[in-house]
Amino acid sequence: MQDKIIVKGARANNLKNIDVTIPRDKLVVMTGLSGSGKSSLAFDTIYAEGQRRYVESLSSYARMFLGQMDKPDVDYIEGLSPAISIDQKTTSKNPRSTVGTVTEIYDYLRLLWARVGTPHCPKCGKEIRQQTIDQIIDQVLSLPEGTRIQVMAPVIRGKKGEHAKIFEDAKRSGYVRARVDGNLYELDEEIKLEKNKKHTIEIVVDRLIIRPDIQQRLTDSVETASGLTGGLVVVNLLREERDLTFSQNYACEDCGISIEELTPRMFSFNNPFGACPTCTGLGSQLKVDPELIVPDKSLSILEGAIQASGWNNIRGDGISRMYFDALAKKYHFSLTDPWETLPEDVRSIILYGTGGEKLELHYDQPRGKGVLYQPFEGICNNVERRYKETQSDASKRELEELMAECPCPTCKGKRLKKESLAVTVGDKDIDALTRMSVVDELQWVDRLELTHQQHLIADRILKEIKSRLGFLQSVGLGYLTLSRSAGTLSGGESQRIRLATQIGSSLMGVLYILDEPSIGLHQRDNDKLLATLQNLRDLGNTLLVVEHDEDTMRAADYQIDIGPGAGIHGGEVVAAGTPEEVMANPNSLTGQYLSGKKRIPVPETRRPGNGKSLKVIGAAENNLRHIDVEFPLGTFTVVTGVSGSGKSSLVNEILFKKLGVELNRMKVHPGRCDRIEGIEYLDKVVDIDQSPIGRTPRSNPATYTGLFNDIRDLFASTQEAKSRGYGPGRFSFNVRGGRCEACSGDGVLKIEMHFLPDIFVPCEVCKGRRYNRETLEVRYKGKNIADVLEMTVDEAVEFFAPLPRIRNKLQTLCDVGLGYVKLGQPSTELSGGEAQRVKLATELSKIATGKTIYILDEPTTGLHTDDVRKLLEVLQRLVDSGNTVVVIEHNLDVIKCADHLIDLGPEGGDGGGTIVCTGTPEEVAACRSSFTGQYLKKVLEK
């Protein structure tokens, strides 16, 4: 078997026809500056080719659904294994996905509960026993005399198929009717069912009217129905249109409540047989939030306290004013009174309506005047009704801004119906177990006491559960709960979950390609992750890891450094070999940082701040334990702590959202805290995250930074443009006039392929240049507008050197390390780190007020150590202007450069949520109880 993967002539994106040799069955780390071409080689070339070859081996029928995959721009690749990509972009946003379902641990838990669970009565909590035929008959005969019923046998429950044989057998056995999916059919009819839909079929065994003399006939019918289904009988009350379900298997003797036989689907919130009927298994509902309806309680109704669309403009004589005048008159309040001073009952009536009580509405319209008498439904009820009734997506989005996710009133956020939650294993229902952390669940499995018979049934299931929980703990995710929604996980967490799932699969001979698995991981947990990667390698797999973490580089068997620069300055193999060989290579920037020849310096002094501070009092979101936290203003503050310690809850959920509501008028629901003091010292909060700067190819760095407006003004001021009468709008590719109309200024045409992905092809008219011929004839210094958009930032700085307004904005893009990016590069092609730096550059180019607080969550994601150096210089510049920067970070190079640290912990999940220590990096390094301090001490001593 070949012992290496050989790549010849890779040219994807910025790769310069490179040849690479990768040893098989080794841990290979790919390094280099951000934008140097690592992902182009790892994902766009090696993974894409591995995937394409696998898809080609499938049948034409399977390929029809997967689509034709393009061959990457490479001469050939030898020795390639089936490739599995574990990146950070495929986090599921489906609200039905949880940590438990993604890892498949929940499937094993459902099986455990179905096989050894003890059912209880959902009403009284008593353990449920099997129900006899006599008990079923007694309950049916207790119905009021004259009740019309039909006894039915549910032979099929929620199964896909046409089920033609079921109908034939029933007809042959002499049955006349069947209820299919809630509708009654004669069996003489031709009943056609959709093959790929789930159906429920109930054979009507008998129809009866409740009388004392029907006992024998009812007994025969119930026994027949029970015999057809293995113990399950449905009695349908015809007039009331409701069903009574009886089971010979489980029923409460006191309440007469029976539940069906325990099956795994009964514990699935993604199946109608297990899901809560109110929220259909989501655990939450969208409800109008009064806090978002009235964000500023100091305003009066007349001043615009109410921010719901349709109710926020009452200065005229419209319908909303008519209602408010009537409410004020009836309940004796003034529209000029601040909302917070209105009596509680008045506020409740305005929000939730008058019930049946009618208002006296005086109208004065051009058509006439008069009085109407009608009730007021309340603003919350009005918004909710409009949300349900509207067909417009835009209206729905607007109304959703006034709504928040609230726990389902029926299941209290537990997702399952009450019958499913009444089944226990080891005195716990399945929801209670999934709300425990992975570490606690492992202890629960070890302590679980079962009978000998239950052990015989459950041992194999428990072994699978225990091993998968162990894998999660081994990748540093012991603080997570299985009930945690997959959409709330960070990129690093979701990647490590999929990594744990892959270890559980125990495949060998596979090529795994990972994208920065250490993201979001504290240094303490890094060793666990490395041990996991080495374990995966030792199974007989090749691991190709794109990484910037020094510990991972040192642990590698082989390292490939791509560079030397980024973008057009990268795309070459600078060094390849063992980490020691890369360190010895003078051309490798990565090697210089790894060997310590280059390093990010520790600041000589720490800023004390401007004497003012922001205080979060009583922070209690998620696992935070009513802590008080002080953020000194005018400093560079970093919030640290192990994964799951509460950093994001404190900074993103409480601090950012609360400041956003107060300063930016954002419509969000801040995390729980008593109050925040010191907001008056700030005038703006800016969250600089790694989300895209735009969702379409029309958005690019030039448009986002505002640079493109200046460039269009410049072209409009040229002599040629003036003589033709062209204004700045002529040079926009978003409006008619100067753009190419064949592609509407996109430069590409989208061809819809229906069930295949859409294909983009260059526009044949403008050849991808976006503008029409006349517009491109206008030139500045020999370049037209399309040429300028094709320039890199470095080239543009030189080109626009005599124009300070344009040059300064371009210089800020250079300062954040984006000199290699093209001005017109579509935002969809920028990485998360690049998008974040475009936002930083935009903020840098604004005039500083000195009263802004910037919040960044792990800004070093995707950044090389040299890029981190540039990022730190930019952040320090923001603080030098009098602003405050608050960063969540694990990167020790960032932590050591902070003015002030807030270390949360000591552990993750339930073991976290408290302040371990605060102070300068030197003070935290001296704190023995701080895990961050222990690692920081080593870095500061270098």
Model-identified regions with their sequence ranges:
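Conserved phosphate-binding elements of NTP-dependent enzyme cores
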Residues: 1-942
